[in-house]
Design a protein with these regions (language model features):
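Alpha/beta-hydrolase
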Residues: 1-57, 64
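Short beta-strand/loop motif that positions the catalytic acidic residue
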Residues: 62, 68-70
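Catalytic histidine neighborhood in serine/cysteine hydrolases
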Residues: 88-104
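Active-site phosphate/pyrophosphate- and oxyanion-stabilizing loops and adjacent acidic/basic residues
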Residues: 56, 81-85
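Structural motif corresponding to alpha-helix initiation and N-cap regions
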Residues: 52-56, 77, 110
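Conserved alpha/beta-hydrolase "acid-adjacent" motif
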Residues: 51, 70-82
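Short, conserved loop/helix-junction motifs that constitute active-site signature segments
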Residues: 59-63, 86-90
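Catalytic active-site module of serine/aspartate enzymes centered on a nucleophile-bearing elbow/loop
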Residues: 99-128
Length: 128
């Protein structure tokens, strides 16, 4: 079995990563919130499958209420906007941008988590 992905970066190398998503993601998943049994490695075949996967391939088939949440400063915001535009199977849809949040910060920064939870609570009350 062939594995990929064990970067084992120093703090200096992490600080030099060019995008918040990678820098904060490495800190979050590798340092502050890593599971003790996680190796941070993927089987190479799984990584290749993940790289080929496109979550928007069939998003037009979604015909139920859709709520998408993204940070306004997220490096990945363009992906959410693209997916939202392609979600043509429903008119009951909303893309919420959490002001000031990056992608990873929406996981743990209290005011960003609260903003997401408030939106989700209202959405689920209305749609479930």
């Amino acid at each position: 079995m062939l594995y990929s992905g064990d970067a084992n970066l120093t703090d200096e190398q992490i600080a030099k990563l060019p995008f918040d998503l990678y820098r904060q993601g490495y800190e979050y998943y590798w340092k502050t919130h890593a599971h003790p049994n996680s190796t941070f490695k993927y089987t190479t075949s799984s990584l290749l499958d993940l790289m080929r996967f496109d979550a928007t391939d069939h998003i037009a088939l979604v015909n139920k209420p859709l709520l998408m949440i993204a940070g306004s400063k997220a490096d990945s915001l363009y992906m959410s906007e693209d997916a939202f535009a392609k979600a043509t199977g429903t008119t009951d849809k909303e893309l919420v941008r959490i002001e000031g949040a990056t992608h990873i910060e929406t996981y743990w920064v209290p005011q960003y988590v609260q903003a997401a939870m408030d939106k989700l609570t209202g959405f689920y009350r209305r749609t479930l």
